[in-house]
């Protein structure tokens, strides 16, 4: 039985990315860890129409203690957040991986964005990485004006991912794999539930899926 080499697999994903014109959003709570890991991975593999967002009231990152989180407003540049944490306690934030995470974020885009504030862009697929975020995205879409005759479908897919650096990597990889399957599937929208069911059987990654129009 033949197996694909990593180079062959990477080439396949790159080919899929080059052909993909879907607008895809990655959403987590603070647009810092899980959504940015996925955003970074997709861009790294050649996908073009990728955005990422958070749904919380503000961006919360671990601080000196569980009772002292670092709070930043959406729109605060990642470079500014990086400098703030580095000046606060460089050793701590190197040790817990926050500075490394922020270096990645800086390479992807300028600043964290809030999902509820993006009213212009339309997406065909929205990946969320926590059920509370999934619920927040759905609640937001339900509150939007749907009187237009130009409503478009959006598939919201939640992959349940713990908010750790390690889990974020796995969640991003699974989102990439699902997208690759979607791109190779004719009439994918009709078959998406089965695609996700099959993926769950293979990976045990819990998921939720709903179709909305906006």
From Swiss-Prot:
Signal peptide: none
Subcellular location: Nucleus
Molecular function as annotated in GO: RNA polymerase II CTD heptapeptide repeat phosphatase activity
Signal found in the keyword field: no
Major localization listed first in the record, in broad terms: nucleus
Record flagged with keyword Nucleus: yes
UniProt GO BP: mRNA processing; termination of RNA polymerase II transcription
Keywords: Hydrolase, mRNA processing, Nucleus, Protein phosphatase
Top-level taxonomic group: Eukaryota
One Pfam family recorded for the sequence: Ssu72
InterPro entries for the chain: RNA_pol_II_suA (IPR006811)
Biological role stated in the UniProt entry: May be involved in the C-terminal domain of RNA polymerase II dephosphorylation, RNA processing and termination.
Family from the record: Belongs to the SSU72 phosphatase family.
UniProt name for this protein: RNA polymerase II subunit A C-terminal domain phosphatase SSU72
Originating organism: Dictyostelium discoideum (Social amoeba)
């Amino acid at each position: 039985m033949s197996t694909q080499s990593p180079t062959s697999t990477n080439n396949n994903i790159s080919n899929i990315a080059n052909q993909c014109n879907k607008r895809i959003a990655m959403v987590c709570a603070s647009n810092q860890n899980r959504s940015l890991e996925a955003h970074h991975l997709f861009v790294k593999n050649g996908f073009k129409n990728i955005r990422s967002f958070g749904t919380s009231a503000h961006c919360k990152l671990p601080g000196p203690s569980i009772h002292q989180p670092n709070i930043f407003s959406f729109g605060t540049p990642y470079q500014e957040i990086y400098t703030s944490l580095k000046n606060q306690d460089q050793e701590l934030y190197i040790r817990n991986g926050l500075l490394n995470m922020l270096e990645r974020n800086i390479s992807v885009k300028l600043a964290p964005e809030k999902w509820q504030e993006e009213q212009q862009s339309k997406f065909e697929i929205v990946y969320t990485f926590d059920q509370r975020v999934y619920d927040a995205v759905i609640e937001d879409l339900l509150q939007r004006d749907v009187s237009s005759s130009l409503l478009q479908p959006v598939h919201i897919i939640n992959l349940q991912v713990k908010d750790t650096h390690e889990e974020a990597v796995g969640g991003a990889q699974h989102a990439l794999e699902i997208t690759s399957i979607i791109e190779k599937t004719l009439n994918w929208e009709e078959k998406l539930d089965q695609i996700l069911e099959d993926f769950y059987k293979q990976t045990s990654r819990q998921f939720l899926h709903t179709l909305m129009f906006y």
